[in-house]
């Protein structure tokens, strides 16, 4: 069907940009202005994600690497950016207009030629496209010391296979070793050519409900990461696959809705790391009751466009383990696995279908390094790749009894890489293997081992099945949504009730606190009143005692005064006896008055100093004792 005639589809996603690019670092000039900077997903170049219409700033000259092509030059002459413009790096359009038209027509032809039938669960079941296993070889551009290698297409081969041949001459004979694969890409090949011939059918099958896996295998520095991620001008397999997947979703003519989620992890020194979540907790490999191998906890994020995928991958690549090696300035030191989950919902049949695409960038095998950390990393990398080779060899032998390889125990658990790829390698996913090689003479052994690995992978078992549709998921989801809304209303009601009760409780607590304060204050007042009453009672007793004492003292004073008066009278009488009667008579009146005055003066209270008062008290006391 034509894309122009298809009706709008409710995908549940933001409409993706067509044929957008995956963000990467392109080859650029070195600081000296010559040479080239190898591609690196972690190179700290700034990018502008918000504006894709600004053309890239370039120099007018065309440069090549004067020191020979690097692992990521791939024999292509690049237009390099002029110095000082890296911080203004923006992304240009991915394809020329003619390529856009070609891709659109190609997709329309695929839609019109692929037969479909509706299964019992309401899903349209597309015929499987391509073969179960696709093996491809990519030759890195030659630096120097080229070995004796050749490649080409087999003539009259019904499968359209291609060969790569090594010819070794000795003094007595010529030895020729030939390997056959689905595709052999020469040094002049482009990333899009590789994607179109080796990966595109896998992506289409994923859209149709099958699982697929694409992984790059090869020696360090042969262009695995370049092939998988690409550069700004030449996007790799991952961005091209995401572009195609979103394009298929956008042009789908059914009423199905789609969701695309991705996870991204790395295996470094046999430790799994969630690159998206980037938490301290190490994810663990778990196997459920149905035999499915999963990683938990692992972050899966919803993406709505290729641009979002680009940004997520770029942020993850910035923290991925890389280091300089003898072959490459930026070399991946870990296996990276990007998993894409396509969730397809049929609202009519109330079914859902989940298919997955795994994009694996394996760390490169290498010889032992003198650097301690690189040597340790290399040991883990080589061990996992050796286990992968053993697993593939024994799976191939089990699937093809005619092979002489050992088909004994399959050591999936000896490496976390093979444990994660267990289901895919055992035939449940369509496999596309891209083996990258270098045909330089000093890499002959590594190249031969890589070709043997890819040859064995062609014999892996195939039991590819379409993902099952889960029935009534949509209806159950609608029911759950309804229950969720009801629960939300109840939660809102109870939340308001709790708020009101909380307010009432606070008011009650305030009132109780006030009563407690009043009670505490009343208790204090009562205690003070009792204390005052006790003190008052004590004072009353003291006052009564003082009054009694005062009364006693007054009686003593009266007695003393009376005694003094009696003494004065006695003295006066004695005086009268001594003087003549005449004088006595003459002075009677005056003497009486004087005695009266003297008595009056004695009755007056004298205010004396303390010591005199004490002396007087003592004399009074003595006199009182005498009187008594």
Swiss-Prot record:
Residues 588-628 are annotated as: Disordered. It holds the Pfam family Kinesin. One of its GO terms (cellular component) is cytoplasm. Residues 530-557 form a coiled coil. Residues 603-620 have a biased composition (Basic and acidic residues). Interacts with mal3 and tip1. This is Kinesin-like protein tea2. It comes from Schizosaccharomyces pombe (strain 972 / ATCC 24843).
């Amino acid at each position: 069907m034509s894309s122009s005639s298809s009706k709008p589809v409710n995908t549940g996603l933001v409409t993706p940009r067509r044929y957008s690019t995956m963000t990467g670092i392109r080859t650029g000039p070195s600081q000296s202005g010559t040479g080239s900077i190898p591609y690196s997903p972690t190179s700290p170049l700034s990018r502008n994600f918000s504006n894709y219409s600004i053309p890239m700033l370039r120099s007018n000259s065309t440069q090549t690497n004067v020191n020979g092509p690097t692992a990521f030059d791939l024999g292509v002459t690049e237009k390099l950016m002029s110095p000082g413009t890296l911080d203004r790096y923006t992304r240009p359009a991915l394809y020329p207009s003619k390529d856009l038209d070609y891709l659109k027509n190609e997709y329309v032809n695929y839609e019109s030629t692929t037969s479909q039938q509706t299964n019992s669960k309401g899903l349209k079941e597309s015929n499987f496209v391509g073969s179960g296993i696709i093996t491809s070889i990519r030759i890195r551009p030659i630096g120097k010391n080229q070995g004796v290698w050749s490649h080409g297409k087999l003539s009259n081969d019904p499968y359209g296979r291609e060969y790569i041949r090594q010819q070794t001459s000795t003094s007595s004979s010529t030895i020729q070793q030939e390997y056959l694969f689905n595709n052999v890409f020469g040094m002049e090949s482009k990333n899009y050519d590789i994607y179109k011939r080796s990966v595109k059918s896998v992506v289409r099958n994923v859209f149709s409900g099958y699982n697929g896996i694409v992984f790059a295998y090869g020696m360090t520095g042969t262009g695995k990461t370049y092939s998988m991620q690409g550069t700004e001008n030449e996007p790799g397999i991952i961005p091209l696959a995401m572009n195609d997947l979103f394009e298929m979703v956008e042009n789908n003519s059914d009423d199905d809705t789609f969701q695309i989620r991705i996870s991204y992890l790395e295996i470094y020194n046999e430790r799994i790391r969630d690159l998206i979540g980037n938490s301290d907790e190490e994810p663990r490999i778990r196997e459920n009751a149905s035999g499915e191998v999963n990683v938990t906890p692992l972050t899966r994020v919803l993406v709505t466009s290729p641009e979002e995928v680009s940004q997520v991958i770029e942020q993850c690549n910035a923290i991925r383990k890389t280091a300089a090696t003898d072959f490459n300035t930026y070399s991946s030191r870990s296996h990276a696995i990007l998993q894409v989950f396509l969730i397809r919902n049929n609202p009519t049949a109330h079914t859902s279908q989940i298919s997955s695409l795994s994009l694996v960038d394996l760390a490169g095998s290498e010889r032992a390094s003198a650097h301690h950390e690189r040597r340790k990393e290399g040991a883990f990398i080589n061990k996992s790749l050796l286990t992968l080779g053993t697993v593939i060899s024994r799976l191939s032998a089990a699937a093809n009894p005619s092979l002489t390889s050992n088909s004994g125990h399959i050591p999936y658990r000896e490496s976390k890489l093979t444990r994660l790829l267990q289901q895919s390698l055992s035939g449940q996913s369509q496999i596309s293997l891209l083996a990258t090689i270098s045909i330089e003479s000093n890499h002959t052994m590594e190249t031969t081992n890589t070709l043997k690995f890819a040859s064995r992978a062609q014999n892996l078992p195939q039991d590819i099945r379409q993902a099952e549709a889960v029935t009534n998921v949509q209806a159950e989801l609608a029911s759950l949504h309804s229950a969720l809304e009801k629960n939300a209303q109840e939660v809102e009601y109870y939340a308001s009730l709790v708020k009101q009760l909380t307010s009432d409780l606070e008011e009650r607590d305030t009132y109780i606190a006030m009563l407690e304060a009043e009670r505490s204050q009343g208790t204090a007042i009562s205690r003070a009143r009792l204390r005052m009453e006790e003190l008052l009672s004590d004072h009353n007793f003291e006052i009564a005692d003082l009054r009694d004492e005062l009364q006693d003292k007054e009686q003593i004073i009266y007695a003393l005064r009376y005694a003094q008066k009696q003494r004065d009278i006695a003295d006066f009488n004695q005086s009268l006896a001594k003087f003549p009667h005449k004088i006595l008579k003459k002075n009677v009146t005056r003497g009486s008055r004087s005695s009266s005055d003297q008595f009056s003066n004695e009755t007056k209270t004298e205010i004396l100093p303390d010591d005199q008062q004490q002396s007087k008290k003592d004399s009074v006391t003595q006199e009182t004792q005498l009187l008594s």
